[in-house]
Structure formats: C-alpha cells, structure tokens
C-alpha cells in the first residue's frame, strides 16, 4: 500500500467559498490579535478559487463590514450597488409588479450590491493569503480522517492518476493527508464529506431533512440601451404550474451584463419536469425576451442550494470540527441571500476554534460556535422567515406566498409565530409517470433558448476522462428496472448538464449511460434521485466547471 505524506495545521478548511475563506481570514485575525502564530489551510476542488462558485448574486455586506471594514476600497463587488428592486408576478404573456409596500423592509435590498460571487471569493482569497492562509486549489478532499477515539483529525485529498478501471497510471500520485486540530467543512450545498459527517455523528437527529432548489444561471451581454446597472428583478409564477415552486432573477451588473436565472425547488412531483427547460421557457416571456433581444449569452452554470432554513440546520459541531456555510444550510430563501450568513457562520466557527486552540484544546466539540449562532443576528434573521418555504409548498405559489407574507410581517413586528412547519425529503415527492402529463417546452432556437450540451460548453467544464466515474450507483440495475418504468428515469431531465441518458429503448434494450465528463457539480442527482441510488463523490481535483465571472 502506498504511504501518504501528511502535513499538520491548526485548522483545515474544506472549500474556498465565502464561508471557508471568511473562516480562514477570521482565524488569522484572531491569532494576530492574541499574538499567536496559528496555521490554517483551505482546500479547493476547483482549478482555482471561484471556479466552482455560482450565485446570482445580490449580497448583503453586513458580514463583509464586520470582517474587512475597508472592503469597498478595492473589492469588485463595490462597483454596483443595488439601485432598484422589483418583484414581478408572471403569467404566460403579462407581468404584475408587486407593490413595494406589500413586502417587509428586510426584503427591499437596501444597501446591497450585485456582482459575481466567484469574483468576491477570488478577492477574499487574496486577502486571506496576505494574512498567511495557505490555499490549495485543484485539490479535492476525498476522505475524512479519524483518530483512534473516532474524532475527526483532518482530511485526505484524492489520489491523482487513477485509471477508470482503478489501476494506477504512469502519473499516479497518492493523496495527501492534512491533519488538523479542527476541520471545517465548507463544501457548499450537499457536500459529499458533509453527508458522511452528518451520518457518522447523527447531526441531523433533531432537525428536519434538508430541502433544496436547483438554480440554473446564464450571464448575458445585453444591448447597452437596455442596461441599468443596479436594477434587481425577481419573478414568481409562470412558467411553473401547480406541481412545482420556484422563481427567477434578473440582475443588471457591471460591464453591460445581466445575470439571469431560475430556481426550481426540488420537491416537484411531475417526473417530466426539467429545471433546465423551465429556465429556457421562462426566457420566452415577452418582458424577459425583450431585455435579451440583440444580446449574447456568454456563460452558463447550475448549482443546487439548501432551502430548508432554520429547522433544517443540523447540529453544527462534532468531535474535531464544524459545519459552516451552505454545508449547514444558512440560506435565507425569501431574501434570496446566503452569502452574508455563510460568511458569518465561518467567522463564528473560526473564533471558537482559535479560542479553543489557544486554550490548548483540540479534537473536541467547539460548543462556543453553536452558542454564538444562537445569540447571533443570523439565527434571528432565519427565524423570522422559517415558515415561508413550507407555507408556499403546502398552499401553492400564490396562497402560500400570501400567507408567508403575513407571517413575515407579524414576525417583523415582533409577533413570533407559535409554530415551526416541517419539511419532507425532496426525493420522496415524485408521482408515477402515468399520473401526470409532460410539460411543453420550447424547441431551442440557439438565440434565446438553448440545449444542454451547448450550455455545458459555456461552463468550461472539463474532467480527465480516464478516471473512475464519480457518479456512483449503489445498484446499477435500478435506473432501468425501477426508475424507467415508474418515472421514465427522471435523471434524464433533472440533470442540467446532460449527464444521464437512456439509450437503446427504441430497440427494446434500454441502457443507463452516465456521461460523467459533463458534470457541473450541481449535486441535483444526489438529492432528487427517488431511490437515493446515485451517490456523488469527488472526481480528481481541478475537474468540473471553470466559471469565470459567475
């Protein structure tokens, strides 16, 4: 057996997103304040920091103001403050603008900024490195390391140079062990190691199941005459019907570009729904098509998001580490924001870890982190909106949204609801194919609407082809023998990258094909597969999308 080299750190962080980078920065800040020399490294599976980051994004700067008060001096996010905030309710041909006074003040986007979250993370990485943080892009954390007492003591990166059949190629290199006094998992939504941590330590015992949405995003260069920097629009209603929930966004950002996208909540019941196709159909609405006329699509991507809110947040700590950011699920769905809460979670965990290490502790539970969360503005913010998502799911888009609005207003005025509604797993919601009708989707015209393969091309996705398939099946027979007759194999449609296909059905010999090289790491298959037969694991580090400005 090949021996792996090891490197010791005080803290190891898995994932260079906003939570992981904020944790690293705050950890070094606290160490400097106490006159201590503490070490921290950040592992990032993307080819560079930001390569796998995708968001709208409209960002509340509250955590940035706390972490780096002078951020406006040189951060690219500061270029475009939000100047206008609109909410459209769509029918197939028309829109209704929701009156501003109908929504609570915390939904108004006052003082926020719109821009690329990937570029914000690149900027944060630079600030982290200035403080002495070591960042390793292109290294995927593939294994959790446990000590003899079962406590987490770090992670190991994946082996490189392994062929599809599992044999070692000529360029084989074993993974590297990174040992830590505390390990933070900041993998984002549905992290594969986070799943193992939650299962191993039963962290979800007292929380609801996490629930999810799939965001499909495009970046467009539009007609300069139509561009209004700082204009932010959210939509609800069409094209989704009674069997699905979600909504769209249009953000006028820097350089004449518009970020647009559509989130489909993954509790939908019709197995013929395609979140990718819903987004393409949404663009054909007259108001949206007019904005994009004469423009050009320049980038594409997709990513699942955690929608469960407060009641789905698991226990945040375990012996030897913590969950931060969207690994835990701090997204505020009604505000359509999670960057500020993710950053704050990382900062709170970092402060707890620094204090513990300076007190000569290691590998125990950082109880100060959940205590800080309980006393923080993050928990208060999430508590106010905790019933919004379940109300919309239970009562539908319009009645549910109305009831949700009432609860938010009451909570805003301090009238706390005496109940918290429950969530149910997204993979349990599909109906049999014979009980539903397939939606009608537009044929791609290559100008306004597109197919999945040409879209994946714009994500700059690349994987080493001669490596083990990272989309694993617990039982290879299930897709054809169960999912196909029951649901017409929904993986063909819920995947936004064309990874899954059924071929040979026309000659009576159906076969399930996995085009793993197309995978944009959205994690939807791991979430929505009705039998939970698909398990997403990391491919070689550096593989996946390379989002330049998303």
Where are these regions (language model features)?
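Active-site-proximal substrate-binding core of FAD-dependent oxidoreductases
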Residues: 329-335, 347, 351-396, 513-515, ...
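Glycine-rich FAD pyrophosphate-binding loop
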Residues: 28-53
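Predominantly flavin-linked oxidoreductase catalytic cores and closely associated redox partners
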Residues: 118, 122-123, 127-288, 348, ...
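Iron-sulfur cluster-binding cysteine motifs and their immediate structural context
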Residues: 485-516, 523-546
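FAD-binding beta-loop-beta segment adjacent to the flavin cofactor pocket
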Residues: 302-333, 455-466, 479-494, 501
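N-terminal FAD cofactor-binding segment of flavoenzymes
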Residues: 45-94
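C-terminal auxiliary extensions adjacent to catalytic cores
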Residues: 392-447
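Beta1/beta-strand and adjacent pyrophosphate-binding region of the FAD-binding site
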Residues: 4-19, 41
